[in-house]
């Protein structure tokens, strides 16, 4: 897993964005999140248990605590009440992207290089639109997967342009859990050190 500084990914646009009502919701929510120091991962309006607006967000370092979810919820609720983009009652659910997270930015592919991902493309690449494999390289224009399941005659590696990506998600493995926990522990230690430095000033 690669480390990125906050400055590298703070304003990085998402590769995969919403459409329709979800896009309108993202347009309302994202500026509020950015002002608080968070990044929007995804917004989805779902019709389960009534209507639920699911907002996935994270700090620039990739972390998201329960307190962060509460802070985001308290900040976006009044804005959503004023804008009133949904014409029915709904439940607001704010969460972290989780360990098996959606991959929505170029930096996600850099950060999680070496891990398994499943993805879909909007166009055929090597005669298919669905892929699964380990991210072996990520650049400015796309990423390379080493496929773990190939059919006869297919190449082991495939390069997918970011412009063709329509969906991508990490696959839960023991290595992913280990690296995610390690990254979370490091981020918490850095935050604690920052808080100590702020207290001394």
Swiss-Prot record:
<dbReference type="GO" id="GO:0006412">
    <property type="term" value="P:translation"/>
</dbReference>
<dbReference type="Pfam" id="PF17384">
    <property type="entry name" value="DUF150_C"/>
</dbReference>
<dbReference type="InterPro" id="IPR003728">
    <property type="entry name" value="Ribosome_maturation_RimP"/>
</dbReference>
<comment type="function">
    <text>Required for maturation of 30S ribosomal subunits.</text>
</comment>
<dbReference type="GO" id="GO:0005829">
    <property type="term" value="C:cytosol"/>
</dbReference>
<protein>
    <recommendedName>
        <fullName>Ribosome maturation factor RimP</fullName>
    </recommendedName>
</protein>
<dbReference type="InterPro" id="IPR028998">
    <property type="entry name" value="RimP_C"/>
</dbReference>
<dbReference type="InterPro" id="IPR035956">
    <property type="entry name" value="RimP_N_sf"/>
</dbReference>
<comment type="similarity">
    <text>Belongs to the RimP family.</text>
</comment>
<dbReference type="InterPro" id="IPR036847">
    <property type="entry name" value="RimP_C_sf"/>
</dbReference>
<keyword id="KW-0963">Cytoplasm</keyword>
<dbReference type="Pfam" id="PF02576">
    <property type="entry name" value="RimP_N"/>
</dbReference>
<keyword id="KW-0690">Ribosome biogenesis</keyword>
<dbReference type="InterPro" id="IPR028989">
    <property type="entry name" value="RimP_N"/>
</dbReference>
<dbReference type="GO" id="GO:0000028">
    <property type="term" value="P:ribosomal small subunit assembly"/>
</dbReference>
């Amino acid at each position: 897993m690669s480390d990125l500084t906050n400055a590298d990914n703070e304003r990085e646009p998402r590769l995969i964005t919403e459409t329709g009502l979800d896009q309108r919701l993202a347009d309302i929510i994202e500026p509020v999140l950015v002002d608080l120091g968070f990044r929007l991962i995804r917004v989805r309006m779902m019709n389960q248990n009534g209507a639920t607006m699911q907002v996935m967000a994270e700090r620039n370092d990739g972390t998201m605590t329960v307190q962060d979810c509460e802070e985001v919820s308290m900040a976006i609720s009044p804005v959503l009440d004023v804008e009133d983009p949904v014409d029915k009652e709904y439940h607001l659910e704010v969460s972290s992207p989780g360990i098996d997270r959606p991959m929505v930015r170029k930096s996600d592919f850099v950060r999680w290089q070496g891990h398994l991902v499943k993805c879909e493309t909007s166009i055929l690449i090597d005669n298919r639109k669905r892929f699964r494999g380990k991210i072996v390289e990520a650049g400015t224009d796309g990423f390379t997967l080493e496929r773990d399941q190939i059919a006869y005659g297919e190449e082991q590696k495939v390069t997918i342009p970011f412009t063709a990506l329509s969906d991508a998600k990490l696959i839960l493995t023991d290595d992913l859990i280990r690296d995610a926990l390690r990254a979370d522990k490091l981020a918490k230690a850095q935050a604690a050190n920052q808080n100590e430095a702020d207290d001394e000033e």
